[in-house]
């Protein structure tokens, strides 16, 4: 049974969308696994249903940083945050040590290395800026976990929860990710397209 989290979500056209259909699986997993003490790095916030679910659960509402690279949904994300009375921090851009370009494919927007104008941020700078120590990651980001594996592998030593979609396997080596998670004491509790790992 999914814990009840009430929210109102609008898309980039100002239309109310059914969060029990759109992005439903992600926020349902959040509702089950995120704990009040978590300090959350969210990769791929989009309209914010998982963002809002996280923020309703955690004790310190400001200890959440939600990343979204697609400028088409930034205004909707900001509005949904406000309407649902949340306090998570929105970063309009991506975490990367390299320049990125964006590819828009409806819900499957993703980034890759290349000349582009997406603002990029350093992971450790974000931790310092918002005075957080991330111990949970929620990722619906079309393969962007590759960036963490390749450039910030140390992050996996401090997390105790990872929720992610296994999308864009051409971009992200998920077998490598599984090995990194196991080496850092995380075990799989849900597997498939949506995956959940927790610290043992």
Regions found by a protein language model. Give the residues of each.
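Phosphate/nucleotide-binding beta-alpha loop and adjacent structural elements of enzyme active sites
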Residues: 1-200
């Amino acid at each position: 049974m999914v814990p009840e989290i009430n929210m109102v979500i609008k898309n980039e056209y100002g239309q109310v969308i059914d969060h029990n259909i759109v992005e439903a699986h992600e926020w349902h997993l959040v509702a089950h696994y995120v704990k009040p003490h978590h300090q959350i790095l969210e990769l791929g916030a989009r309209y914010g249903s998982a963002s809002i679910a996280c923020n309703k659960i955690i004790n310190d509402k400001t200890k959440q940083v939600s990343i979204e690279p697609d400028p088409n949904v930034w205004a909707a994300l900001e509005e949904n945050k406000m309407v649902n009375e949340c306090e998570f921090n929105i970063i309009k851009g991506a975490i990367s040590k390299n320049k990125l370009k964006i590819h828009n494919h409806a819900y499957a927007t993703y980034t890759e290395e290349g000349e582009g104008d997406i603002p990029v941020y350093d992971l450790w700078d974000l931790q310092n800026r918002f005075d957080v120590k991330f111990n949970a990651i929620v990722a619906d980001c079309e393969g962007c976990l590759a960036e963490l594996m390749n450039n910030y592998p140390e992050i996996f030593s401090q997390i105790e929860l990872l929720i992610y979609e296994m999308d864009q396997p051409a971009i992200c080596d998920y077998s490598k990710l599984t090995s990194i998670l196991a080496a850092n004491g995380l075990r799989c509790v849900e597997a498939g397209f949506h995956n959940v790992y927790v610290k043992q």
